[in-house]
Amino acid sequence: MIQVLLVTICLAAFPYQGSSIILESGKVNDYEVVYPQRLAPLPEGAVQQKYEDTMQYEFKVNGEPVVLHLEKNKGLFSKDYSEIHYSPDGRRITTHPLVEDHCYYRGHIRNDADSTASISACHGLKGHFKLRGETYLIEPMKISNSEAHAVYKYENVEKEDEAHKMCGVTQNWESYEPIKKASQLIVSTEQQRYMEIVIVVDHSMVKKYNGDSDKIKAWVYEMINTITESYRYLYIDIILSGLEIWSEKDLINVETSAENTLKSFGEWRAKDLIHRISHDNAQLLTATDLDGPTIGLAYVASMCDPKRSVGIVQDHSSVNRLVAITLAHEMAHNLGVRHDEGSCSCGSGYTCIMSPVINPDAMKYFSDCSYIQCWDYIMKENPPCILNKPLRTDTVSTPVSGNELLEAGKDYDRDSSANPCYDAATCKLNQGAQCTAGPCCDQGRFKEEGTICRRARGDDLDDYCNGISADCPRNPYHA
């Protein structure tokens, strides 16, 4: 069974109106201070993990109590995940760290169907969550021997540079005939795609973070954890296959010209990286200040191409979420997604991921246009490298019902008496059961077609069950 840890956070919340504090994200005004405290012990007989599979935190935001439900992002790393760095004499050093018991979670706020969360629990709680349409950031405060955390909105982070930041991709690439109607595009979990990526960190990043490889790794892991949530809405799993750090020097000429650097990176990937690490896509993360307002660039409709399934991203913000959105943006170009135009929407008042101008208030959602363009490209071009499902890293042992593990040969990992869909002796689905859980699953049966499973955001339309899946398919139409 997925081990459940119920944690209540006792929060003394103190809004600091007009005051400021220096946090990892920068100088922050108007924040709340909270003190997490674990009150509930582990269930009797449960095995203690360093980081539990499931956690719940209760706290107040603006005086209102909320419950944050978190689940470990078990698909974050590939089974053969590797890390590479270089010695002073130029030797390549490859390691395969144990990543099963990592500390990166995704989740939601209870009783808020539109909420999301992306949290690192490595050293306190750090990340962001969306509550009632508003995005909040949370991170530990830099106070010795204290459990204090700050909760705040991005708008309260003082901006050092107000200049517009843009993707360097232009709209003049060769286009293909789009599908005529959104209703022609029907995507389900059976068509899920799997994108294994490698992040390459250049030497300017090493200098920026003072050679602290642990800090660089945490920064990258947090970014990937964020974008996995964004890509779930496109039915694409993002898996980190490798992280390469150019610890001593750059292996290509990293220029301020985004075009030249992208070309060099693609050529290097084709002749070097692709032969060492199994992956579908590579992204270069640099602290080099690219020319003009450009903070990212990628080839369009290039997935699986050895030289062109690449992008570059400038580490342009101290707010991890903003760099993560830029990364998600460039990767989407590789999947055939163009920049959003005026008619594209991801909810009333929201700026979507594929806006050509990287908006500080951007949500981590793709627009209806992006959804259609991505799957139009996948269906027409059928890039083969994203078809294979990576191996899972779950524990494998003799299947025993109710033993807290999801093992080979079992459909379920909890005491089956708690779920009418399962046979307690075999941990297999009962005859006639269609599903176990999901927004369109009710007592082991798919909900009827037309049942609302996700309420609209703003002017968007509701999402409806299709009668053939437990998942809630995204409505391709928009208001």
UniProtKB/Swiss-Prot annotation:
Where are the catalytic residues? Answer: E330
Q: Which GO terms describe its cellular component?
A: extracellular region; plasma membrane
Cofactor annotation: Zn(2+)
Specify where it is mainly localized: secreted
Q: Where, by tissue, is this protein expressed?
A: Expressed by the venom gland.
The protein's GO terms of the molecular function aspect are: calcium ion binding; metalloendopeptidase activity; toxin activity; zinc ion binding
Question: Which GO terms fall under biological process for this protein?
Answer: proteolysis
Cofactor binding, per record: Binds 1 zinc ion per subunit.
Q: Where is this motif: Cell attachment site?
A: 457-459
Keyword Protease among UniProt keywords: yes
Locate the residues binding Zn(2+): H329, H333, H339
**Which Cys pairs does UniProt list as disulfide-bonded?**
C304-C385, C344-C369, C346-C352, C435-C441, C440-C465, C453-C472
Q: Which InterPro entries match?
A: Disintegrin_dom, Disintegrin_dom_sf, MetalloPept_cat_dom_sf, Peptidase_M12B, Peptidase_M12B_N, Reprolysin_adamalysin
Residues annotated as binding Ca(2+) are: E196, D280, C385, N388
Short name of one Pfam family for this protein?
Pep_M12B_propep
Q: Which residues form the signal peptide?
A: 1-20
Q: State the EC number(s).
A: 3.4.24.-
Q: Which PANTHER family match?
A: ADAM A DISINTEGRIN AND METALLOPROTEASE DOMAIN (PTHR11905), DISINTEGRIN AND METALLOPROTEINASE DOMAIN-CONTAINING PROTEIN 28 (PTHR11905:SF32)
Q: What else is known?
A: The disintegrin belongs to the medium disintegrin subfamily.
**Complexes and interactors:** Monomer.
What name does this protein carry?
Zinc metalloproteinase/disintegrin
